[in-house]
Amino acid sequence: MEQPRRFDLPRACMRTAVLLPAAHLREDGGVSACRAHLREDGGASSAARFRADPRRNSNLRGGASILYGAPRQFFSRRNFRFPHRSVTKGAFYLNTRVLPPDEAALKEAAALIRGGRLVAFPTETVYGLGANGLDAEAVSRIFAAKGRPGDNPLILHIASLDALRPLIACEPSETARRMMRAFWPGPLTMIFPRSGRVPANVSAGLDTVAVRFPSHPVAQRLIALSGVPIAAPSANRSGRPSPTAAAHVLEDMDGRIELILDGGACDVGVESTVVDMTGATPRILRPGGVTAAQIAAVAGASEVDPAVMRPLKEGERPRSPGMKYRHYAPAGDLTIFHGEPTAVAARIRESYDAALNDGRRPLILALDAHRALYGDRRVESLGDSPEAMAHSLFAVLRDADTLGADALFSEAVEADGVGLAVMNRLGRAAAFHIVEV
């Protein structure tokens, strides 16, 4: 039998972060009960030398935590088993590091951006996967790292209003200026005619460009230090639930990017609202934290594109991220039930029991107020309001994968206000498999 290898562990190599099941992090920051996952011949006692900083520790809801200070060769693919996921070596294999966003880490991240590399960073919505938005080759690395189709446009992120004008081909309208004053910095993206400075692959060949001014201080500082607009979709593998914690990013992008800035959990929890400003009336292409009613109150009117709650038609091009493909999806099959709560609960119980009898591993996603309707069946909480659902939805979908669920049954909410953003994300995760009860 092959003997597990032992390593010398110089301090110089102790800057990498790795995922550990939450049960293996002691309250004092050490590591315990790791023998099932670590094949180092010292067992758990050897692992206990590496400590998690509780001030910087990012907990993955119900699943794992990021352990800072562990040397990567100790936690190699040979000696450490990552539960619930696999990592494929290949062209993307990089030494992915996770750092707290202090000034030194931000300067290093900005240098990587300027050098055409990729950095994951927190925003108030979700974590973004950033590259120099004026460098077509750097932008192409985003598509490659994510496995993202080339016809799915990106958003440029700026850190000042002055940075907008060079990116767009015309002066913003008075309506756009009012919306900037009301919602920037914040979770609103606006689409304008694209200037010649913006590479075509940022906009997937469209003659428009999507621009956002985020409010998260880490995002703002990174953009300012980089000195360029940062092109950034969500920092996950294409089709997966968007990341709202650094642990989610590491789960999807480990080995594919060089650096993750860990700014803690995101506040909003769903991506920004995307509004097309090229017509007479602001048109919502992707709902988010800024609602249609809020936009109408500032702009005088707003309209919601029909594709928000349906797949694109054959030959229809996506004008915004999140319009064309199945997004945000867990590994299991997801079905959404809409209707009166007790009737919905009855249908979900019936579907759950049928899946269980078929040998599947079902899971129910429900509002807190309805949990009692499901008895002792497995239920993941969606929160107690549409706002709470928006904040926790992507983490819940990732938890479903951690639990090994292969048949998911979710309650719906009414598609208005923030509920429209929730139903848009749930709908795309379920390929719009919505059952009316």
Predicted regions and their residues:
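Active-site-adjacent structural elements in enzyme catalytic cores
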Residues: 67, 78, 88-437
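Pore-lining transmembrane helices
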Residues: 5
